């Protein structure tokens, strides 16, 4: 990249914080750094003109984990660690919504669905078997059962 003298002088000197990526994580980091260190010079670096990561492609930041993801987490983490992880995800979303406002990010809490292909029947059966147990585990966070069985909601073929 060829930068002019002025671009180098204005953009790339006296930087206190350099953040790579201008998706939700990068922008949130810049916002909170600026709030904590108002006199700091912060630069956001992005590979292209627009962000290219997950922030522009899905609403994964608004999810705390599907049933199969929570079950997978429990294979490598304790119940308390998984609870802390889910709680952190929920708090992160609450902080984002408080910081930016639901209207400005067009946030709508529609919920989510986990779809299982017919070839994933073992995972599907495991989720059905463990659903009540995971709902009980997460009840302290959500004060309600959050996972429910919905059959053929979208009428996709080869999907459970």
Identify the meaning behind each predicted range.
Residues 86-95:
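N-terminal FAD cofactor-binding segment of flavoenzymes
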Residues 22-27, 47:
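Glycine-rich Rossmann-fold phosphate-binding loop(s) that bind the pyrophosphate
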Residues 68-74, 98-160:
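Flavin (FAD/FMN) cofactor-binding and adjacent substrate-gating region
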Residues 1-18, 35-36, 40-41:
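Extreme N-terminal leader/targeting segments of oxidoreductases
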Residues 20, 45, 115-116:
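Short hydrophobic segments within beta-strands
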